[in-house]
C-alpha cells in the first residue's frame, strides 16, 4: 500500500482498472481463453509448416471469431465465410478494371468502403461489412508493393485460405470438439447469482457495486438469447425460464442492498429467513439439473407478517409465483427486430460517418504512397478499425489500439533481440510463443473496455516477427514501421473525427437519462399488489432499467473523453448525469421497499400517490433535454388509513420524496454545496 500511496492518482486508477479487468470472473472466459490460446498455436504450426502467408490476419480471424459459447462461435464462423466471399470478390473486381490505374482503383474502392461503413452502423450484420471494409482498403496496398499482376492475384487467392482455414479451425475447437454450451453457462450463472443473494440474506455484507449488478443482469439476458437459439428444451419452456431469469435478477439485485442486522432478530423473522433461503436452495438445485422448479410452499399469516417486518415480502411473493407457474405456459411471441436501423436513410450522421472514414483512409493512403513507405500500410487499417459512431468511443478505440500496438511492439523487440537468436526449430518457437499468446488471449476475453488491447497486442507482435517469414528474423525495421503506421492512422483519425462533423454525445446523454427516468415512472405506475401480470411486468421493466442505467453510465464515460467540449460544461454535465444515475438507482430500490407495505394496504389512495410520484418524475425527465429540470418537491399528507395499518409505508414514501429532492437542478449554473451534501447523504 505504501508504494501505491507514492504514485500519482491517475497511475493508481490505471493500475486498479487493469487489475479489475485481468481478474474479472466471467462464465465462459476460461474455456474461451484456452480455445483461443490453442487455436493460435495451431495457426502458427500450420502456417509455418505449409508456408501460408499473412499469419497475423489468420490470428486476427481467431481473435474475432472464437466467442464465449459454441452457438455464438458457429454464428460468427458463418458470417466470416460470407464476408470472405464478399471481400475477395470485391478485390478481384477492383483489380480487374483498375489494377494499373491507382486513381481509378481508389474511385472504385471508395464507394465500396463508404457502403460498408454505412452498413456497419445501420445493419444488424455489421460485422460482415466491417470485414469487407478492412480487406477492401488493405487490398489497395498489394498493387503498390508489387508490379506483377500474377503475384497479386496469387496473394489475393491466398487470402481465401488465410481467412477460411482459421474459421474451420475455430469451428472444430469451439463447436465440435470442446464446445462451451450457452445452456450450461446459464445454469451456472443463475446458481452463482442465487449464491450471492443467499449470502446477503443471511450475513451482513458490503453491497456490490451497482455497475457490477447491472452487468450481471445484462449477461443473463444475453445468455437467454443464446439459449433460445441453441436449446430446444429451453425454447419449449421459454416462458418459465424467462420468468426465472427475471426473478433471479430481481432477488439478486434487491438482496445486494439488504442488511439483516437492520431488523430485529425475532424468532419468527429468523425462521422465515431460513425458510426463504431453503426455497432459494431448492430453486438452485432444480436449475442445476435443468428442471423447472415447482414449489408447494404456501405462506401463512405469521410468515407474511415476519416477511413484512424484515422487508422481504415482495421477494417471497415473486419466488412463490415462479414456483407455482406452469412450466408449459405458452411464450409471448417476440417481435422480430428489423435488419436495418429505423432512421438508416433519414439520419445524415450515418453517411457522414462513412465519409469521415473514407477521408481519413484517403489522407493516409496519399501519405503512404507519397513517401513510398511500404511498412506503414497499417495506417489505413487503423482508420477503419478506430472508426466509431461518436468522438468518445473513437478515442476509446484509439487508446486501446495504440496501447495494444505499443505492448506488441515492445514484446516483438524483446523477442527479436533476446529470444530469436537461440531458437532452432518450430517446437522451441511454439514454447516461447505460448505465454505471449496466453496473455493476449486472457486480455482479449475481458470486458469490452479492454479486450481489444489483447487482440491488437498479438496482431502487432505477429506482424513484426512472424509475417511472411518461415524462419528466424532479425529485422527491427518491421517493428518500427508497424508501430508508426498505427500512430499515423490514430493521429489522422483523431483530427478527422474531432473537427469534421464531430458526433458528440453531450446532447444525447440528457435524452438517454430522460428515457431511463421514463422507465422508472412506468415502474411507479404499476399497481403495488400481488397480481401475477403486474408483478411480471414490474420485473421485466426493472431489467430494462438495469440496462438503461448501465448505458447512461457508459455514455458518461465516453462524454468525459470529448475534449472538443468546454471543460467546465463537460464536467458539469457529467456531474449532473452521474447524480441522476445514482439517484435513479436509489429511487428504484426505495420504490421496491414501498411494495412490501403497499401490498397490505389496499385502498384508493395508493394509486393516487404512485401517480403523483410518476407525474413528477416524468415532468423532470421532460426538461432534461433543454436543461430546464428542477428538483421535484413532493409533500405527502399523513392519512389515517396508512398510519393505522402500516405506519412504515408513509416513512418509505417520504424517503422517496427526499430522493426526488436530491435530483440535480439543471437550471443552476453549477452544483451548489447543498446539493453536493445531499448527494453524500445517500451514500
Please give the residue ranges for each predicted region.
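Membrane-entry segments of alpha-helical transmembrane domains in multi-pass membrane proteins
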Residues: 26-31, 46-52, 74-82, 97-104, ...
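Alpha-helical transmembrane segments of multi-pass membrane proteins
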Residues: 61-62, 354-366, 376-387, 402-414, ...
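Long, hydrophobic alpha-helical segments that serve as membrane-spanning/inserting helices
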Residues: 1-34, 41, 49, 150-151, ...
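C-terminal functional regions that serve as terminal interaction/effector modules
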Residues: 418-419, 423-430, 434-438, 446-474, ...
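Pore- and pathway-forming membrane helices of multi-pass small-molecule/ion transporters and channels
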Residues: 9-18, 33-74, 84-89, 106-173, ...
Amino acid at each position: 500500500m505504501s508504494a501505491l500511496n507514492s504514485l500519482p492518482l491517475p497511475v493508481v486508477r490505471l493500475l486498479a482498472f487493469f487489475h479489475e479487468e485481468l481478474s474479472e470472473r466471467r462464465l465462459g472466459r476460461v474455456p474461451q481463453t484456452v480455445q483461443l490460446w490453442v487455436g493460435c498455436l495451431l495457426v502458427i504450426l500450420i502456417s509455418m509448416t505449409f508456408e501460408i502467408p499473412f499469419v497475423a490476419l489468420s490470428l486476427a480471424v481467431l481473435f474475432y471469431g472464437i466467442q464465449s459459447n459454441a452457438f455464438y462461435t458457429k454464428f460468427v464462423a458463418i458470417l466470416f465465410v460470407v464476408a470472405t466471399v464478399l471481400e475477395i470478390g470485391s478485390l478481384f473486381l477492383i483489380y480487374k478494371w483498375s489494377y494499373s490505374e491507382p486513381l481509378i482503383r481508389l474511385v472504385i474502392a471508395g464507394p465500396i468502403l463508404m457502403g460498408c461503413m454505412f452498413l456497419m452502423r445501420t445493419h444488424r450484420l455489421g460485422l460482415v461489412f466491417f470485414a469487407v471494409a478492412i480487406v477492401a482498403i488493405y487490398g489497395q496496398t498489394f498493387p503498390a508493393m508489387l508490379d506483377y499482376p500474377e503475384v497479386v492475384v496469387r496473394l489475393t487467392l491466398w487470402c481465401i485460405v488465410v481467412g477460411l482455414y482459421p474459421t474451420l479451425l475455430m469451428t472444430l475447437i469451439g463447436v465440435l470438439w470442446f464446445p462451451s454450451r450457452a445452456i450450461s453457462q446459464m445454469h451456472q450463472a443463475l446458481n452463482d447469482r442465487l449464491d450471492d443473494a443467499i449470502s446477503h440474506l443471511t450475513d451482513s455484507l458490503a453491497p456490490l457495486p451497482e455497475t457490477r449488478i447491472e452487468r450481471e443482469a445484462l449477461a443473463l439476458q444475453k445468455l437467454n438469447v443464446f439459449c433460445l437459439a441453441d436449446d430446444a428444451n429451453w425454447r419449449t419452456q421459454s416462458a418459465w425460464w424467462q420468468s426465472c431469469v427475471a426473478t433471479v435478477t430481481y432477488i439478486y439485485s434487491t438482496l445486494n442492498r439488504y442488511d439483516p442486522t437492520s431488523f430485529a432478530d425475532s424468532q419468527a423473522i429468523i425462521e422465515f429467513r431460513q425458510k426463504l433461503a431453503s426455497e432459494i436452495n431448492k430453486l438452485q438445485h432444480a436449475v442445476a439439473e435443468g428442471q423447472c422448479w415447482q414449489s408447494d410452499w404456501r405462506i401463512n399469516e405469521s410468515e407474511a407478517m415476519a416477511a413484512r417486518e424484515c422487508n422481504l415480502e415482495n421477494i417471497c411473493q415473486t419466488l412463490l409465483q415462479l414456483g407455482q407457474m406452469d412450466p408449459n405456459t405458452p411464450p409471448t411471441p417476440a417481435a422480430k427486430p428489423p435488419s436495418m436501423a429505423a432512421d438508416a436513410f433519414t439520419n445524415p450522421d450515418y453517411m457522414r460517418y462513412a465519409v469521415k472514414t473514407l477521408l481519413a483512409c484517403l489522407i493516409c493512403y496519399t501519405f503512404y504512397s507519397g513517401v513510398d513507405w511500404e511498412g506503414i500500410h497499417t495506417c489505413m487499417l487503423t482508420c477503419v478499425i478506430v472508426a466509431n459512431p461518436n468522438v468518445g468511443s473513437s478515442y476509446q478505440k484509439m487508446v486501446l489500439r495504440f496501447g495494444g500496438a505499443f505492448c506488441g511492439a515492445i514484446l516483438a523487440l524483446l523477442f527479436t533481440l533476446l529470444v530469436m537468436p537461440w531458437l532452432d526449430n518450430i517446437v522451441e518457437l511454439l514454447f516461447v510463443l505460448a505465454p505471449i499468446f496466453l496473455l493476449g488471449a486472457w486480455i482479449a476475453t475481458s470486458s469490452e473496455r479492454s479486450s481489444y488491447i489483447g487482440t491488437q497486442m498479438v496482431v502487432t507482435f505477429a506482424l513484426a516477427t512472424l509475417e511472411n517469414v518461415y524462419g528466424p528474423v532479425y529485422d527491427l525495421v518491421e517493428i518500427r514501421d508497424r508501430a508508426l503506421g498505427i500512430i499515423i492512422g490514430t493521429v489522422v483519425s483523431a483530427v478527422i473525427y474531432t473537427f469534421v462533423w464531430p458526433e458528440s454525445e453531450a446532447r444525447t446523454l440528457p435524452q438517454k437519462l430522460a428515457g431511463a427516468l421514463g422507465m422508472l415512472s412506468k415502474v411507479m405506475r404499476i399497481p403495488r399488489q400481488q397480481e401475477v401480470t403486474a408483478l411480471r411486468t414490474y420485473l421485466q421493466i426493472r431489467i430494462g432499467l438495469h440496462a438503461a442505467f448501465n448505458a447512461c453510465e457508459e455514455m458518461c464515460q465516453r462524454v468525459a473523453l470529448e475534449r472538443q467540449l468546454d471543460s467546465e460544461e463537460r464536467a458539469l454535465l457529467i456531474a449532473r448525469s452521474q447524480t441522476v444515475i445514482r439517484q435513479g438507482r436509489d429511487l428504484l430500490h426505495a420504490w421496491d421497499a414501498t411494495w412490501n407495505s403497499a401490498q397490505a394496504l389496499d385502498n384508493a389512495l395508493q394509486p393516487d400517490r404512485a401517480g403523483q410520484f410518476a407525474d413528477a418524475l416524468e415532468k423532470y425527465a421532460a426538461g432534461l433535454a433543454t436543461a430546464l429540470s428542477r428538483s421535484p418537491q413532493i409533500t405527502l399528507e399523513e392519512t389515517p388509513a396508512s398510519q393505522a395499518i402500516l405506519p412504515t409505508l408513509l416513512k418509505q414514501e417520504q424517503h422517496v420524496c427526499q430522493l426526488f429532492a436530491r435530483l440535480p437542478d439543471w437550471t443552476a449554473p453549477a452544483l451548489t454545496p447543498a446539493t453536493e451534501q445531499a448527494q453524500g447523504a445517500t451514500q
